[in-house]
């Protein structure tokens, strides 16, 4: 199972969930992926799109000795999973999207928390004496301490011993813009043969509009290989807000047709 983070995340975000997943489902292994221009996957050639990120997964599978049987993606990573499913026709594949709507989000991206974080990063220096100095600068600029500490996972040590923010923010903007405009509903409307898809929605999140929720429910009613799960107490960060509830879904017995 591939585990994919969201924008400005890293593969480490899903380490705890992945470990518990393979403990509960020992026939599976887990691969924590740094998506392009995140973590250790820096400097890949463009274009920087959801489709390119999905192609990276196909290339990753080609480099492994074992086949990939599934993928889970949060937020941006969820749309990467949906795009990746286009290449999975006739292959047994278990796919999970975590609070990731198939809809384009359009102009609303400019008011999102992620866009505000990027604006903050762009206004700050590129180098800091330490991780603590970076966190302090982010907090002083108005970001919550938890967000600043999470972003610090992207820091890299320079040859001079300083810290610099690893991802190229221009590339990150390209990825966000493509994600914001991507419409993945056709994947759900004609789910590739051999694939199952579970969509997990945070009950306190606004990522899925009321019409989105209604539409995925209708699709699930028509296709037994699509399931929708609402975790009422979770916000967008489902794996943080309700880790146990998410694990219960990921490790629940599959129905015969799945």
Regions found by a protein language model. Name each.
Residues 82-86, 90-129, 134:
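Flexible "cap/lid" loop of the alpha/beta hydrolase fold
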Residues 160-221, 227-230:
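Conserved serine/cysteine hydrolase catalytic core
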Residues 15-18, 22-76, 86, 248:
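Active-site loop/oxyanion-hole signature of alpha/beta-hydrolase fold enzymes
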Residues 8, 35-39, 102, 235-238:
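Alpha/beta-hydrolase active-site loop signature
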Residues 2-6, 201:
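The conserved beta1-alpha1 loop
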Residues 6-9, 75:
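Active-site glycine-rich loops that stabilize anionic/oxyanionic intermediates
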Residues 231-247:
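Catalytic histidine-centered segment of alpha/beta-hydrolase-like enzymes
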Residues 126-178:
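Conserved alpha/beta-hydrolase catalytic His-Asp/Glu region
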């Amino acid at each position: 199972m591939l585990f994919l983070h969201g924008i400005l995340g890293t593969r480490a975000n899903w380490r705890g969930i992945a470990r518990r997943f393979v403990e509960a489902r020992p026939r599976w292994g887990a691969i924590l992926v740094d998506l392009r221009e995140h973590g250790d996957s820096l400097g890949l050639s463009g274009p920087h799109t959801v489709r390119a990120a999905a192609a990276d997964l196909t290339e990753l599978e080609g480099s492994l000795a074992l086949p990939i049987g599934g993928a889970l993606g949060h937020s941006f990573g969820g749309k990467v999973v949906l795009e990746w499913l286009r290449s999975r026709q006739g292959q047994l594949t278990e796919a999970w999207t975590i609070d990731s709507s198939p809809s384009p989000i359009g102009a609303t991206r400019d008011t999102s928390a992620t866009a505000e974080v990027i604006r903050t990063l762009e206004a700050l220096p590129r180098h800091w004496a330490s991780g603590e100095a970076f966190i302090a600068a982010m907090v002083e600029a108005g970001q919550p301490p938890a967000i600043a500490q999470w972003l610090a996972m992207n820091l890299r040590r320079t040859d001079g011993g300083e810290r610099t923010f690893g991802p190229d923010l221009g590339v990150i903007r390209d990825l966000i813009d493509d994600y914001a405009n991507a419409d993945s509903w056709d994947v759900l409307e004609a789910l590739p043969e051999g694939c199952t898809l579970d969509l997990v929605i945070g009950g306190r999140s606004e990522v899925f509009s009321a019409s989105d929720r209604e539409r995925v429910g209708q699709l699930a009613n028509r296709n037994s290989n699509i399931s929708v799960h609402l975790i009422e107490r979770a916000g967008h960060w489902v794996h943080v807000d309700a880790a146990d509830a998410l694990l219960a879904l990921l490790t629940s017995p599959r129905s015969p047709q799945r």
